[in-house]
C-alpha cells in the first residue's frame, strides 16, 4: 500500500493519503484539496481555483488531473467555469486516513 504522509492544515495533524491508484499530479491535487485557505475538503467543497493554486500545477494540467479524478470516482466539480467548486466523493474522502 502506497501511503503519502502530510500534515492537514485544518486539523494540524499528521494524516495519510492512500495513493495506490493515483498519479503524482493526482496526489498533488488531493493534498491541495486538504491544504487550502478556504475549506477542508472533508467538510464539503472548496473553490477549484484554490486547489489549483495550492497544487502547484498549471490550470491546464490541473483541469486534466481533475477530469481523471472524476473518472476514477474520487471527485466532482459543480458550478460554471471560473466559479466552480471542487469536492470529493465518499470514495475520494476514504483515501485519507489518520493512521
Give the ranges of each region predicted by the language model.
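A short, conserved structural fragment
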Residues: 70-80
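Short acidic, hydrophobic short linear motifs in intrinsically disordered regions
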Residues: 39-54
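Long, low-complexity, charged/polar intrinsically disordered regions in eukaryotic proteins
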Residues: 1-20
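Short helix-coil-helix linker/hinge
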Residues: 20-32
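Short amphipathic alpha-helical interaction segments
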Residues: 56-71
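Short helix-capping/turn signature of helix-turn-helix
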Residues: 35-36
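Short, cationic-aromatic polyanion-contact patches
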Residues: 80-99
Amino acid at each position: 500500500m502506497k501511503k503519502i504522509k502530510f500534515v492537514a492544515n485544518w486539523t494540524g495533524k499528521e494524516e495519510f493519503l492512500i495513493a495506490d491508484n493515483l498519479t503524482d499530479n493526482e496526489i498533488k491535487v488531493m493534498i491541495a484539496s486538504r491544504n487550502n485557505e478556504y475549506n477542508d475538503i472533508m467538510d464539503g467543497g472548496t473553490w477549484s481555483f484554490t486547489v489549483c493554486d495550492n497544487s502547484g500545477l498549471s490550470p491546464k494540467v490541473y483541469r486534466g488531473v481533475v477530469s481523471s479524478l472524476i473518472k476514477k470516482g474520487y471527485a466532482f466539480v459543480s458550478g460554471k467555469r471560473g466559479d466552480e467548486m471542487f469536492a470529493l466523493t465518499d470514495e475520494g474522502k476514504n483515501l485519507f486516513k489518520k493512521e
